[in-house]
């Protein structure tokens, strides 16, 4: 074999021949003794071959469809240069080499075509991108070196997605910045206070529903929303105030969010009356429109009838309609519909007051139905005695029917505003659960009975009380309850986003309309204000609150900034004091005592009873407990009472009756700790005392800077004096008078007290109230007290000291004490054990040509100096000057005080002149 036949095929993919070595290049394209011409031709041939190989490589990347063209193109290109070479002067050995080269390429091309058609080649095509070939290595190096610097190239880092680009410089910088900066913060990364500030915009926009829905977003939103909701609670109903107090007692942490407590907008519970006094609204026509709109919105949201009772009789009988009007006029004497108050919440666990069948709405409904049925029966009867008998029977029947309908979940609309259909004689109602016969059907039944027996008309009360009617009514109610239970079981798996619809199909004719029951998922807005119990309806015109509720709120809200108790009426309350008494041990045991574990009856029932209004028991109940305890203690200490004949049956523990559910409840209500209870009547003075004690515990820091108590009669003068003076004393002890920190406190007692002409019954700051208290104290002194305080009788003995005094000084008083506390006034309660405190002052009155002004100065630790610069210019009208009402009152009191002092000096001078004349006459 020749050397050319032993050469291997080399695929040249680049013009960089140094990669393959010069020996291979010389053996392929250079022969021994060849000239420069042949070398140049061979170089061009090799260049063509390299370009052809690159084109074939680029075509090979596109897919299997172009494989045949790629295999045929090198054959033609290889033949053309070699044939040209053979036509020119070329050696024979080179021609033979080219001929074999073309044969080899053709054979390789045929093998490639056969391989591509095979099944193995088709499998390889799927994994072709994963195979690392020489061409792929070349392209990767091309990306790394040539195109990475060109941002507009398709091989740049911005457009390529190769594996090596992940480790490029840009990716490293990006990862470095990510680790340095971390994750981008969102709204949940903000502090709770900042989120609460953002959510407070909903409160400013009066969007309360959106604010409440923010409670269900996330935990951080829940905390922030609670801060906004509890910051300024708004109450118009005493029932909601009672709920709020119980909620704070169950969750004391929420009380720290309350900043403003406003109880000045409470309204009475009566609705439906047109009298302005009972509603407590404005005198304009807007109050009546607001009341109607409120009643209409309440009835619409609750699916209730209007507040005024509607007629339940068809309009065919004009005589009956006239009787309805007369009965409606008589029914106006009955109290109207009323909303629940704090007493309804207090007795919510009592069976007599907690039943929904006995609320004022059911009472209104029963009255309207009884009047309508009475008018129908009276139209059919003739005698007076029969009318009276039918009236009573129909009332009893209507009450029984309404209560039975309420038990079976009958809608209120079907009970109070049902109508009759006389065209087809069928009963039509608002719900298929309602099984109450309307007046039209009853009238039709009575007409049939009249035609069958014309001698005597059967009264409607007999129809409703017949055994057939009761049997028919019970069967229909049983079917309705069965259908309701089946539909409720079938609808457990059906849930929507907003509500669930339950359709009750009871198999009745088509004229029966199926009702729809909707369950709303908006829990905060699904419960409406309840109605008052009919036994508590007499308290509906009042808007009072027990004193214990106010003390609870002040105790549970330590961060109050503003307190508004204007227009508030306080109800009498008592504090429960448990007295521990030693019980005589009859036996002794060496075994350790076993403590009985108590069973919890619920979070609300486990709350400690601090005040009497915290429980559902009345004053007589606790008085009876104290009497029982006193008798049992006397029986244990007096030996003569141990005889069985002197023991009373009430001394023994009562048996557990059917109303007591568990023995734990019986044990809780009959323990010795509860029996030994002493009731102490609460005084409104404790409101001010609690505020001052809380400030004392905080080291003189008073967060409560605004107190409003306007138009209240329970606020007495000694209460206001104690509150003002003790607050001022705390500023003297813990703070400096130079920074004027007391000027931040703003108090308002406008038109309060039993006398509205009090000097302190106004709006003023703390230092203004102190000045008013001092001047009011001096103005209330008698003549002897003023003479002693201002040295009127003794100043002539110290004439030298008074002559050298500054002429601008009108009066200077001695030191005097102002006593404040529960025992400092004559109108204070005698049972108060709080000792009266005192604070020393000195008054200095200066004259000036400018408007009156004053200031307080702490001269020493012993007393405080009050300086009043009194305007003596009569041309200046203080009423027209821009001064506050406290300054005007101080100016008026000071002028009166100066006039009294001048009159006392004139009287003393006249007395002294008379004495001198008498002494001179006696000498002569």
Curated annotation (Swiss-Prot):
Q: Which residues form the F-box domain?
A: 185-236
State any GO CC term: mitochondrion
Endpoints of the signal sequence: none
Q: Where is the composition biased (Polar residues)?
A: 63-90, 298-314
Compositionally biased region (Low complexity): 369-385, 414-434
**Keyword Oxidoreductase among UniProt keywords:** no
Q: Which domain of life is it from?
A: Eukaryota
- Residue ranges under compositional bias (Basic residues)? 287-297
Basic and acidic residues bias: where?
274-286
UniProtKB keywords: Ubl conjugation pathway
Enumerate the transmembrane spans. none
**A biological process from GO:** signal transduction
Give me the ranges of the annotated region Disordered.
35-103, 271-328, 369-396, 414-460
Q: Which InterPro entries match?
A: F-box-like_dom_sf
Task: Say yes or no: keyword Repeat present.
Answer: no
According to its UniProt entry, the function of this protein is described as: F-box protein probably involved in ubiquitin conjugation pathway. Involved in the resistance to ciclopirox olamine (CPO), a synthetic antifungal agent.
Q: What is this protein called?
A: F-box protein COS111
Q: Which organism is it from?
A: Saccharomyces cerevisiae (strain ATCC 204508 / S288c)
Gene from which the chain derives: COS111
């Amino acid at each position: 074999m020749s050397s050319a036949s032993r050469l291997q095929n080399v695929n040249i993919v680049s013009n960089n021949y140094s990669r393959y070595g010069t020996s291979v290049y010389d053996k392929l394209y250079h022969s021994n003794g060849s000239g420069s011409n042949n070398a140049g031709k061979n170089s061009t041939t090799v260049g063509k071959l390299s370009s052809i190989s690159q084109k074939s490589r680029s075509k090979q990347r596109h897919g299997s469809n172009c494989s045949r063209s790629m295999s045929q193109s090198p054959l033609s290109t290889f033949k053309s240069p070699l044939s040209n070479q053979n036509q020119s002067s070329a050696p024979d050995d080179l021609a033979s080499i080219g001929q074999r080269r073309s044969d080899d390429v053709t054979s390789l091309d045929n093998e490639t075509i056969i391989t591509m058609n095979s099944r193995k080649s088709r499998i390889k095509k799927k994994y072709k991108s994963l195979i690392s070939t020489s061409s792929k290595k070349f392209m990767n190096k091309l990306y790394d070196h040539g195109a990475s610097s060109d941002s507009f190239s398709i091989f740049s880092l911005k457009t390529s997605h190769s594996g090596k680009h992940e480790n490029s410089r840009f990716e490293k910088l990006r990862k470095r910045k990510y680790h340095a900066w971390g994750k981008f913060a969102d709204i949940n990364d903000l502090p709770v206070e900042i989120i609460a500030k953002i959510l407070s915009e909903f409160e400013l926009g009066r969007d309360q529903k959106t604010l409440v829905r923010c409670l269900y977003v996330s935990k951080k939103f829940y905390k922030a929303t609670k801060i906004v909701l509890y910051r300024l609670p708004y109450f118009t109903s005493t029932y909601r105030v009672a709920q709020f107090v119980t909620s704070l007692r169950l969750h004391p942490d929420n009380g720290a969010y309350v900043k403003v407590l406003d109880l000045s907008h409470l309204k009475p519970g009566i609705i439906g009356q047109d009298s302005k006094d009972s509603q407590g609204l404005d005198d304009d026509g807007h109050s009546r429109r607001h009341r109607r709109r409120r009643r209409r919105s309440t009835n619409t949201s609750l699916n209730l009838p209007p507040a005024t009772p509607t007629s339940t009789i068809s309009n065919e009988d004009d005589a009956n309609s006239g009787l309805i009007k007369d009965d409606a006029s008589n029914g106006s004497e009955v109290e109207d519909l009323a909303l629940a108050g704090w007493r309804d919440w207090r007795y919510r666990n009592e069976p007599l007051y907690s039943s929904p069948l006995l609320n004022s709405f059911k009472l209104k409904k029963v009255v309207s139905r009884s009047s309508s049925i009475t008018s129908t029966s009276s139209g059919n009867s003739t005698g007076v005695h029969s009318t009276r008998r039918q009236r009573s029977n129909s009332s009893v029947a209507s009450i029984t029917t309404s209560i039975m309908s309420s038990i079976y979940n009958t809608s209120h609309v079907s009970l109070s505003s049902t109508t009759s259909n006389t065209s087809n004689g069928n009963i039509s109602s608002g719900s298929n659960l309602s099984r109450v016969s309307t007046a039209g059907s009853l009238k039709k039944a009575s007409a049939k009975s009249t035609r069958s027996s014309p001698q005597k008309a059967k009264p409607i009360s007999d129809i409703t009380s017949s055994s057939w009617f009761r049997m028919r009514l019970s069967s229909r109610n049983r079917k309705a309850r069965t259908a309701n239970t089946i539909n409720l079981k079938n609808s457990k798996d059906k849930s929507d986003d907003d509500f669930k619809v339950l359709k009750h199909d009871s198999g009745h004719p088509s004229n029966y309309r199926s009702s729809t029951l909707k369950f709303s998922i908006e829990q905060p807005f699904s419960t409406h204000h309840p109605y008052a119990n009919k036994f508590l309806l007499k308290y509906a015109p009042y808007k009072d609150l027990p004193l214990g509720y106010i003390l609870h709120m002040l105790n549970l809200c330590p961060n109050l900034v503003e307190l508004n108790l204007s227009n508030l009426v306080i109800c009498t309350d008592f504090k429960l004091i448990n007295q521990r008494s030693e019980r005589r041990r009859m036996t002794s045991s060496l075994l350790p005592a076993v403590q009985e574990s108590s069973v919890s009856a619920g979070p609300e029932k486990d709350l400690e009873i601090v005040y009497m209004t915290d429980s559902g028991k009345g004053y007589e109940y606790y008085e009876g407990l104290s009497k029982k305890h006193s008798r049992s203690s006397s029986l244990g200490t007096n030996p003569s009472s141990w005889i069985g004949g002197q023991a009373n049956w009430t001394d023994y523990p009562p048996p557990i009756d059917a109303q007591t559910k568990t023995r734990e409840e019986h044990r809780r209500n009959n323990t010795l700790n509860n029996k030994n209870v002493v009731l102490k009547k609460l005084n409104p003075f404790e409101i001010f005392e609690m505020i001052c004690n809380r400030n004392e515990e905080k080291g003189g820091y008073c967060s409560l800077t605004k107190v409003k108590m306007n138009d209240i009669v329970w606020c007495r003068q000694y209460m206001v004096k104690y509150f003002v003076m003790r607050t001022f004393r705390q500023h003297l002890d813990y703070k400096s008078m130079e920074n004027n920190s007391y000027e931040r406190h703003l108090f308002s007692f406008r038109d309060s007290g039993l006398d509205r002409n009090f000097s302190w019954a106004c709006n003023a700051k703390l230092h203004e109230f102190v000045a008013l208290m001092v001047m009011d104290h001096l103005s209330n002194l008698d003549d002897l007290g003023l003479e002693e305080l201002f040295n009127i009788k003794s100043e002539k003995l110290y004439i030298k000291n008074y002559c050298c005094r500054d002429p601008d000084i009108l009066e200077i008083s001695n030191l005097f004490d102002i006593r404040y506390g529960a025992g400092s006034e004559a109108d204070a309660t005698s049972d108060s054990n709080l000792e009266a405190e005192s604070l020393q002052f000195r008054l200095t009155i200066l004259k000036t040509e400018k408007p009156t002004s004053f200031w307080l100065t702490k001269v020493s630790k012993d007393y405080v100096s009050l300086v009043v610069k009194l305007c003596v210019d009569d041309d200046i009208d203080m009423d027209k000057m821009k001064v506050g009402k406290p300054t005007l009152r101080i100016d008026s009191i000071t002028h009166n005080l100066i006039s009294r002092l001048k009159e006392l000096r004139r009287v003393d001078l006249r007395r002294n002149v008379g004495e001198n004349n008498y002494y001179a006459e006696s000498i002569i």
